[in-house]
């Protein structure tokens, strides 16, 4: 047996449903994918429910499941994981939130929840960090930019709770909501008040920021309000290396995925030019993967763009991006010391523009892997594969067994 390392390649949102503009095929079926098809033909395939049949997975719960951390035990909300991914060191008990920079008009209505898909908000985040003062509540905070319009907020202090609503109206043309406690608990009441004060102060800071004044002069949407959601209290995770006896790394543009990786103890490996969209640096990601395998036993590589195209309902763009992914994966064929597993984390069908419970295709290729009769990697072909239908909670244990890292159950 020569394989002693694991590549977990997650094609985010790869699964789909029949699309009219693709003659009833899914984008993955319609795409020309000689590399993925070769990996499928040289390995074993199947389909996978990352949480369970009929359950629509979030990107957060699905990645926890794929890494062997049952979300029913470990998931406390998306916010703290996003905050970790944005570079905020989240300690046990801190309250984390996802955040968006958005555009609010003079009437107080949100007109663009992504602030014109603004690219770099670090100056805005720095101003908020320097000028917002929550000391009257006995609370400190961290606020950090993510990719594009995304950001994260973390609160620290005594007597805080995660039981609060969002100010995000979830649609344009509506004013931001007040953050409300979801219970009568004093901790939730306090956190709601802190959040509303943070939003009030940050909105005033953004209104007068030179970067926003310049955007208005250039005809661009200003980032004039922060929308927060996904509150959660940071939990504890058994370190990945201690849990599985493997040194691990994560390569991803999505701050959620890097946050999950860092939370469980994977080393975050940055890559220049990654965007989390269909414009990302695919070649750089795969080259970085190859280099990281020289120093780590396990690498999680997440490629996000297909998910974005699915949410936008752009089946042809999704197909074309899948073909670009496939071309970039040619380097993987050179590695014989690895078990290569390719999978989705969930389906994002273009017809519904949202996550669905449709199972995702999975393939495993490497030394010692049984080879089935499947010759293509897509949702339909893989359903006939030798893995049959598995759960996300199963996949890492299957991979660990293939590199002889599991133990006999019983005698």
Curated annotation (Swiss-Prot):
Superkingdom is Archaea
A GO BP entry is: glycolytic process
| InterPro entries in UniProt | Alkaline_phosphatase_core_sf, ApgAM_prokaryotes, Metalloenzyme, Pglycerate_mutase_ApgM
Catalytic reactions on record: (2R)-2-phosphoglycerate = (2R)-3-phosphoglycerate
List the keywords (alphabetical): Glycolysis, Isomerase
The answer to keyword Isomerase applying to this record is: yes
* Pfam families for this protein: Metalloenzyme, PhosphMutase
Presence of the UniProt keyword Isomerase in the record: yes
Cite the GO molecular-function annotations of the record: metal ion binding; phosphoglycerate mutase activity
Q: In which pathway does it act?
A: Carbohydrate degradation; glycolysis; pyruvate from D-glyceraldehyde 3-phosphate: step 3/5
Enzyme Commission (EC) number: 5.4.2.12
Q: Family membership, please give it.
A: Belongs to the BPG-independent phosphoglycerate mutase family. A-PGAM subfamily.
- Supply the HAMAP family for this chain: ApgM_A
Function, as annotated: Catalyzes the interconversion of 2-phosphoglycerate and 3-phosphoglycerate.
Its protein name is 2,3-bisphosphoglycerate-independent phosphoglycerate mutase
* Gene name as annotated: apgM
């Amino acid at each position: 047996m020569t394989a002693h390392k694991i590549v977990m390649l997650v094609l985010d949102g790869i699964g789909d449903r029949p699309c009219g503009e693709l003659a009833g095929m899914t984008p993955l079926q319609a795409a020309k994918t000689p590399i993925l098809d070769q990996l499928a033909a040289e390995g074993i395939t199947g389909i996978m429910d990352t949480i369970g049949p009929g359950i629509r997975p979030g990107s957060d719960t699905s990645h926890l499941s794929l890494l062997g951390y049952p979300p029913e035990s470990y998931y406390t909300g998306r916010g703290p994981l996003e905050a970790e991914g944005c570079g905020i060191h989240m300690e046990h008990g801190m309250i984390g939130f996802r955040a968006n920079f958005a555009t609010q008009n003079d009437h107080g209505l949100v007109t663009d929840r992504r602030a014109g898909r603004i690219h770099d908000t670090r100056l805005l985040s720095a101003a908020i960090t320097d000028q917002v003062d929550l000391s009257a509540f006995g609370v400190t905070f961290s606020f950090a930019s993510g990719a594009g319009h995304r950001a994260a907020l973390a609160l620290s202090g005594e007597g805080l709770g995660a039981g609060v609503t969002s100010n995000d109206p979830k649609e344009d043309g509506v004013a931001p909501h007040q953050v409300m406690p979801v219970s009568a608990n004093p901790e939730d009441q306090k956190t709601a008040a802190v959040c509303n004060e943070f939003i009030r102060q940050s909105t005033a800071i953004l209104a007068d920021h030179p970067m926003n004044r310049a955007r208005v002069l250039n005809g661009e949407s200003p980032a004039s309000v922060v929308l927060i959601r996904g509150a959660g209290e940071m939990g504890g995770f058994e370190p990945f290396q201690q849990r599985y006896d493997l040194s691990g790394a994560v390569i991803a543009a999505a701050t959620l995925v890097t946050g999950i990786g860092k939370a469980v103890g994977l080393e975050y490996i940055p890559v220049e030019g990654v965007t989390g969209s269909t414009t990302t640096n695919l070649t750089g990601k795969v080259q970085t993967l190859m280099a990281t395998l020289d120093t780590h036993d396990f690498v999680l590589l997440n490629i996000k763009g297909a998910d974005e195209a699915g949410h936008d309902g752009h089946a042809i763009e999704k197909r074309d991006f899948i073909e670009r992914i496939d071309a970039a994966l040619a380097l993987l064929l050179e590695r014989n010391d690895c078990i290569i597993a390719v999978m989705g984390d969930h389906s994002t069908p273009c017809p519904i523009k949202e996550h669905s419970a449709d199972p995702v295709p999975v393939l495993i290729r490497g030394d010692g892997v049984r080879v089935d009769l499947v010759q293509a990697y897509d949702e339909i072909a893989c359903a006939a594969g030798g893995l049959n239908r598995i759960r996300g909670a199963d996949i890492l244990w299957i991979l660990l067994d293939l590199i002889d890292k599991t133990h006999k159950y019983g005698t």
